[in-house]
Each structure stands twice: as C-alpha cells, then as structure tokens.
Amino acid sequence: MRAAVFVCLLLGWVGVATPRRLRGPQADRLAITLYYEALCPYCMEFVTTQLNPSMVRQDRLPFTDLTLVPYGNARTNDDGNVECQHGVMECELNAWHACILEHHDIAQSLKLIACMMRGKKNRLEKCADHYQIDVGDVKNCKKTRQVNDILRKYGKETAKVSFQGVPAVALDNVYNADLSANLTDHFDAIFCAKYKEKFNKQLNNCQ
C-alpha cells in the first residue's frame, strides 16, 4: 500500500493535527487522527484491514484517542461547494460518515464506518442492523442539512495538515509523511511501539 497510496494524491509536508475528541485520561491514550475519504480504495483497505482490526480485535481503542476526518482530497470552491476526488457519491458518503461521527461515540462510529467501507454503496442500514445501532439521528442529520454544511468543519480540520495522499495518519497529533506511509502498512505494530515509547507500557498482544 505504501507505493499505491499516492493514487489518492495531494501535496505533502509535515504538519500538526488537532484532536477533536478526547476519550478519558490523555496520559493513557495515544492520539491517532485519520484523514480519509469514503471511496478511496486505499482508505477502504486501511480502515477495514489495518485500523479496525487493531482497534477492535486487538482492543487498542480503549488506549487510543481516535479522530476520524472524512474529507481527504476534497476541495471547497469559492462558492462554498465541496468537490470530492471520487465524485458526488463520495461527498454524499463522506457526509454520512460525518453525521455518524457527530451523533455517536467513536466506538460505534468506527463499527459503522468500517462496515460501510467494505462496499462502495451506502450500507448504513445494513451495518446499523448488523450492530443493532439506532441511526435515526444520523438519518436526520443527513436529511436536514446540506452536504457542504456537514463537511465544512472537516474541510477546515483537513486544511491544517497537508499530506501526500490518503489515507493520512497523524500520530500523537503530528503528521509525518514517512511515518504515515508505514502506519498504513503496519498500523498495529507501530501503534504498539509508539504507545510503549510514550507511556512505558506494554499492551496485550503486542510483540
């Protein structure tokens, strides 16, 4: 994925990521911020095969301050309209993800978003039924607001960090292009190492 990730391209440099959601004592949680877009194949692969298995199967989520930013390489034009790299459908799906994040905690949000990213169509109903999560508030969010309005704040957050491509991963509130590329291929192993380095604690199932 490291070489292929540049298919979803933007410009690259080192920047600082600002966390949006805190979950418990900061001393116990390593901040991870994912900048992504719903229909980028490499974002879909990363979320479903790297991030979600680490957070759920390896139980890293209680030790993570995880922030998801569904905007990626989208652009907001002078009229305030958002144009997404993979077209109108991606903007719609990004907005659905944003509404999920606004109305559910990160654990439920990750379940729904990872499930949705296993396909290229809107799988919200199917995923909500699978996890028995009420998404009435999510539907109302999407129904009563314009996509441009829903995505505006995520565009502003994304503008704080410039990256070479998505998925882009900031660790401990800092984005580094080389580290991000490694994280997309070896997320759990690097998370374990960085967590131990920062907190001097060895997490379960870390080698």
From Swiss-Prot:
SUPFAM superfamilies on file: Thioredoxin-like
Q: Which Pfam families match?
A: GILT (PF03227)
Localization, UniProt:
Secreted
State the phenotype upon gene disruption: RNAi-mediated knockdown in the fat body or hemocyte of flies infected with the Gram-negative bacterium E.coli results in an increase in bacterial load 24 hours after infection.
Which InterPro entries does the annotation name? Interferon-induced_GILT, Thioredoxin-like_sf
Q: Does the keyword Glycoprotein apply?
A: yes
Check the UniProt entry and state the signal peptide residues, or none: 1-19
Q: Which GO terms describe its cellular component?
A: extracellular region
Q: Read off the Gene3D superfamilies from this record.
A: Glutaredoxin
Known role: Probable lysosomal thiol reductase that can reduce protein disulfide bonds. Involved in the immune response to bacterial infection.
Family statement drawn from the similarity comment of this UniProt entry: Belongs to the GILT family.
What protein name applies here? GILT-like protein 2
Organism this protein belongs to: Drosophila melanogaster
Query: What gene is behind this protein?
Result: GILT2
